[in-house]
Every structure is written in C-alpha cells, then in structure tokens.
C-alpha cells in the first residue's frame, strides 16, 4: 500500500490573451514526492492500520500469499499464510482457525510457540510444501475440519489437538435451506459491530471496553475482503461440517484443551469428546472462555509444546499457521 505526499505547486498563469504561453509571475518550486510504504501487505484491508494491539499488527505484517495447486484443475489459487521464520526438517505443527475467523486468532500464542522452537506454515500447503505427518491443531469449528482431515487423510496427520471443539453440531442445520438472498442478508448481519461486540464479550472473560473493541475489530477484518460474503454463503448452503460420526474413527493420539468458562460450547462436551476418542487426554484451563489461545496463550503454548514433544525426540519442531 503506497501513499503519495505532494507539496503544493503553483499553477501556470496564462497571459492576458490566453495564448497558452506561461508567464513566470512566481518562482518555480521543486516537486517533493514521498512514498510511504505500509507495514502490511497490500492485499489486506486498509482498516488494519486502525488496529491498536501490537501483536496483531506484527502477525498481520507477516501474512503473505503463496500458490497452491488444485487437484481438479491445472491452475493454482493464491492462499494466505504466515511462513516459518526458519525451516527445519522436523515434524510440522499446523494451526487452523475457527469459523468466521482468521489466522490472527493465533496472534498471542504463536510467538510463544516460536520461542519454544516451533515454525509456521499453513495446512493448505501440506501436499505441496510439507509432505510429512503433522500435528494438526483445530480450535472451535476448526476442530471439525481437523477431525475430518485426520480421518480422510491419516497419512498426513500424526497427532491432533482440539481446542474448545465444535464437533457435535449437525452442520449448518436449517441455514442450508435458506434462499440465497436471505443467506446473504444473514451474512451481512454478521458484520454488524453490536453483534460482534456481543460475541466477543461471550468468548472472553471480563475484557476492558477498549480491549473488547479492538479485539472485535481484529475479528472483523476478514469481513472486508471482497470474497468473504460469497464464501460464507457457499459454506452455509453446503451444509457445513457434520463430523460426529467420524469421532470414533480418529486413530491419532489427541489432546483436548478446553476453557472451563466457555459460554459458547458447554465444557461437558469436552468430557463426551474424550470418552469417544480412542486415544485422548483432556486438559481444562481455569478462568478461561471459548478461545484459550487468545485469552490464556502461555497455558495453551505450554500444553501444545509438551504434547508435541511427548514420545518424540525433544528438539525443534515446525509450526504451521493458516
């Protein structure tokens, strides 16, 4: 994103008969042209400049696009990701995000995981760039994506980490039957600031007003991308994810993390999920709501790091973020 800063230049003054000849009544002034580069990639919404939280701004500045080949087409799509600062030949850790969210929800936990010696990529790139079993992390609806992927591509997933998992909903339910016009109306309602403020207050415990407003604005940035509405409507009418029948098919060792004060998904479902998975452990985080990796990043980072390194060589891992 570039901005131009032009100093004022005196306009040409025409002679009495408007002959088109310039009359030098004023001294010439030198044109001063400055180009100011934004700290953010040009494809991100300009509203990102208004975000106050330093860690959100820092992570956003690292987002870039890479081509991802499609199996059903000769073309590639450009997918956004945060690339690793360093790349090592080790086990990747892949971070998904929840529904109606973005990779910025990992802004607090990602730096801690990197400090622990973990790297960053994105799940979209597995077949093209990773090509080895990974530890897949899915928060909220991202947990349904993780389970579906682990069951259908077991060769790609070594371990699972599910955070406040939304895995028992029957897809998008009756929303799948909505006429497209009504679906678009509902999607645009999701953009409203009052609704998003309410959702943020439900997701986190006791946020100060200025933090709640800034976090709400961070959570709304993806709405400003031109394809967001179409993609969300397509997801709604597709029926969404319904993975409850797949849970018992998961063979990978799984860590379940849950905020004890989750007001969006009942934490009793954590116990149910633990009982239905073949090989799982469960850890609950006190005084924490629906998004522990934002609210309690140190606790989540510690749990993830210990789980990734358990039963494997203690060393640097690869962390992948989408």
Predicted segments, located by residue:
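Serine-hydrolase catalytic-loop signature spanning alpha/beta hydrolases and amidase-signature enzymes
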Residues: 88-90, 98-108, 120
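Short beta-strand/loop motif that positions the catalytic acidic residue
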Residues: 250-251, 256-258, 262
């Amino acid at each position: 994103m570039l901005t131009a800063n032009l100093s004022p230049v005196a306009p040409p003054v025409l002679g009495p008969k408007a002959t088109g000849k310039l009359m030098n009544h004023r001294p010439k002034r030198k044109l001063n042209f400055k180009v100011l580069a934004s700290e953010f990639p040009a494809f991100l919404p300009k509203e990102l400049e208004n975000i106050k939280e330093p860690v959100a701004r820092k992570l956003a500045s690292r987002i870039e696009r890479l081509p991802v080949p499609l199996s059903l087409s000769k073309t590639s799509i450009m997918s956004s990701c945060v690339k690793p600062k360093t790349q090592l030949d080790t086990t990747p850790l892949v971070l998904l995000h929840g529904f109606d969210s973005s990779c910025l929800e990992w802004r607090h936990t990602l730096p801690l995981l990197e400090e622990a010696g973990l790297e960053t990529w994105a799940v979209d790139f597995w077949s093209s760039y990773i090509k080895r079993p990974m530890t897949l992390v899915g928060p909220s609806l991202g947990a349904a994506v993780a389970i579906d992927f682990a069951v259908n591509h077991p060769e790609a997933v070594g371990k699972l980490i599910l955070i406040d998992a939304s895995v028992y909903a029957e897809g998008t339910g009756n929303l799948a039957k909505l006429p497209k016009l009504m679906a678009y109306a509902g999607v645009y309602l999701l953009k409203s600031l009052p609704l998003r403020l309410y959702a943020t207050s439900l997701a986190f415990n006791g946020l100060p007003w200025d933090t709640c407003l800034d976090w709400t604005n961070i959570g709304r940035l993806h709405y400003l991308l031109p394809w967001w509405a179409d993609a969300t409507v397509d997801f709604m009418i597709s029926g969404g994810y319904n993975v409850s029948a797949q849970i018992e098919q998961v063979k990978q060792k799984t860590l379940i993390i849950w905020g004890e004060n989750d007001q969006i998904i009942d934490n009793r479902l954590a116990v149910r999920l633990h009982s239905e998975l073949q090989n799982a452990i469960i850890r609950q985080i006190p005084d924490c709501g629906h998004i522990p990796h934002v609210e309690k990043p140190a606790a989540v980072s510690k749990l993830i790091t210990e789980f990734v390194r358990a039963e494997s060589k203690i060393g640097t891992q690869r962390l992948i973020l989408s």
